[in-house]
């Protein structure tokens, strides 16, 4: 049965190769292919995965259970004190009740644990934490070598590549940033490691967009260290060939978008790194992302024409929507992201389509990062249509819908898994990642939310199919200009004395023209001649020829 399904998938892809299918035909074929992938995924499913899907499907219909699970991940596992953790555990049970989606034996264990935590929290809470760590061990891997290395070797034998992202404490100072940088370098030195992801905010703690140029130079120096390590400690492939290890620059906040791109381009334009192949992530939920993709593509083509190596862009939809919404609200800015999922999905398709064009893909390889089988199918067909199979790679999160990942790997001829890793003592630092994944997977419009109970032709399938077709229809017209356009250089302030009070909007330092505006004022002040300030005593003004020298403490 499974070989028949693989044959069906191959047949659909073969029908697409070197054709001139229009958008409508491509969308219809993508739906057919997604159906075949979903069926193939179900045949790939192991017993343990069926149990997990059964549990997750029940959670989708348990509103209080979802809220309890999110709150528990956020509140119970952070405190160092077992007594404090136990208090939070019991409080959440009183607030939400035992989740109804849990099987009976887990409900009983939770009640017993809550009662026992009153008397012996130092015994109960480590057990609860251990259970949580165990259940999330497929999603967040242990970074200790004796546990991580066997897993990497296992994945390698199954022709699965691994992209490692080191999680840890929040980077609040340069000491912690230095430790994180060294952790990534240590990982690159490991023979089993082929590919790492790192954010600029995890290797430099003092990102200051007002001091843009100084920040840029600091981050460039640290990125050079990573690239040098990647070049020095080459990865040995299964066929015996060696290549530099791959460093991927991750994205997080909108404010980091242009800074990350500038760091990436400037370092890779240096003679030392012209032959370095490296990657960067773009988030499709940002309207700016498509224009940034085009800019990176033109830069990469120029670099290639000057003898440089190609690059890779990993295209994701974005996982920090809640944070972007909160920041916009606090500062009274427009939200940096699109305001609805339809536009996000449309932009994602537009970016994949642009990236799959042969004249682009050869120099700028594409990483299609998605668990949405409709999106994956669309990209598979575009890849086949343009004959760019070797330049377009598919990526999924480690531990998420593994049966689906195996089916895709067979269809695509390979797979890259994004794998966060964390030390046992730093597990609490991975909670934010877990909460984001839980929030994302339980969001009503998310594909994984519906996957847990989806079959071809069911209402959940029809819902996701409609969303896919709607976004296909909009991909060529969706907005590609940024939402945040504040410009302190050109704006005019109009005061309306008859209107109600409205606070001034904070300056958005992520915008280059606002950075230049601030820099101009600083330079103007530097060149300004400070007048002599007289003493005023009893309404009389006193001046003197005697002058003193003082030091401005803000200038070292």
Please place each PLM-identified region on the residue numbering.
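Positively charged, amphipathic and often flexible ligand-engagement surfaces
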Residues: 2-500
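Glycine-rich phosphate/pyrophosphate-binding loop
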Residues: 485-540
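Hydrophobic transmembrane signal anchors and adjacent membrane-proximal interface regions, especially
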Residues: 263, 381, 519, 542-547
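Glycine-rich loop-to-alpha-helix module at the N-terminal edge of alpha/beta enzyme cores
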Residues: 535-556
């Amino acid at each position: 049965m499974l070989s028949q399904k693989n044959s069906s998938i191959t047949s659909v892809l073969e029908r697409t190769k070197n054709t001139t299918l229009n958008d409508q035909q491509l969308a219809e074929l993508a739906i057919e292919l997604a159906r075949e992938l979903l069926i193939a995924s179900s045949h790939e499913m192991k017993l343990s995965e069926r149990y997990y899907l059964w549990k997750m499907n029940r959670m989708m219909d348990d509103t209080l259970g979802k809220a309890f699970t999110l709150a528990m991940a956020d509140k119970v596992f952070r405190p160092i004190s077992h007594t404090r953790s136990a208090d939070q555990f019991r409080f959440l049970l009183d607030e939400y009740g035992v989740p109804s989606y849990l099987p009976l034996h887990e409900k009983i264990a939770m009640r017993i644990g809550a009662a026992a935590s009153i008397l012996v929290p130092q015994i109960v809470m480590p057990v609860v934490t251990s259970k949580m760590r165990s259940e999330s061990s497929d999603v967040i891997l242990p970074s200790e070598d004796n546990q991580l290395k066997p897993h990497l070797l296992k994945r390698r034998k199954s022709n699965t590549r691994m992209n490692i992202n080191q999680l840890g404490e929040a980077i609040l100072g340069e000491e912690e940033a230095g430790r994180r940088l060294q952790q990534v370098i240590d990982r690159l030195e490991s023979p089993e490691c082929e590919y790492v992801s790192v954010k600029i905010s995890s290797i430099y703690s003092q990102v200051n967009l007002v001091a843009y140029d100084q920040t840029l130079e600091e981050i460039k120096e640290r990125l050079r260290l990573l690239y040098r390590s990647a070049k020095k400690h080459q990865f040995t492939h299964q066929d015996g060939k060696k290549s530099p290890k791959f460093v991927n620059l991750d994205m997080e906040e909108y404010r980091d978008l242009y800074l990350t791109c500038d760091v990436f381009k400037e370092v890779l334009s240096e003679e030392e790194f012209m032959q370095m192949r490296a990657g960067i992530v773009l988030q499709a939920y940002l309207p700016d992302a498509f224009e940034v993709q085009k800019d990176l593509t033109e830069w990469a083509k120029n670099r290639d024409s000057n003898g440089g190596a190609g690059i890779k862009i990993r295209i994701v939809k974005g996982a920090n929507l809640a944070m972007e919404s909160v920041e916009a609200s606090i500062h009274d800015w427009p939200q940096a992201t699109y305001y609805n999922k339809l536009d996000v999905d449309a932009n994602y398709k537009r970016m994949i389509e642009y990236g799959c064009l042969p004249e682009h893909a050869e120099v700028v390889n594409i990483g299609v990062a998605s668990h949405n089988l409709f999106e994956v199918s669309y990209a598979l067909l575009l890849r086949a249509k343009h004959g760019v199979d070797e330049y377009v790679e598919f990526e999924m999160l480690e531990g998420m819908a593994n049966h689906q990942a195996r089916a895709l790997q067979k269809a695509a001829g390979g797979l890259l898994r994004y794998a966060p890793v964390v030390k046992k003592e730093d597990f609490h630092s991975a909670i934010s990642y877990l909460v984001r994944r839980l929030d994302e997977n339980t969001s009503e419009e998310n594909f994984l939310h519906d996957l847990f109970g989806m079959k071809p032709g069911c209402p959940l399938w029809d819902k996701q199919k409609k969303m896919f077709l709607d976004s296909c229809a909009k991909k060529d017209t969706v907005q590609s200009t940024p939402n945040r356009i504040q410009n302190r250089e050109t704006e005019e302030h109009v005061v309306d004395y008859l209107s109600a009070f409205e606070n001034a909007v904070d300056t958005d330092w992520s915008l280059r023209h606002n950075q230049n505006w601030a820099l101009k004022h600083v330079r103007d002040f530097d060149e300004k001649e400070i007048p002599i300030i007289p003493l005023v005593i009893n309404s009389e003004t006193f001046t003197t020829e005697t002058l003193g020298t003082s030091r401005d403490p803000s200038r070292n």
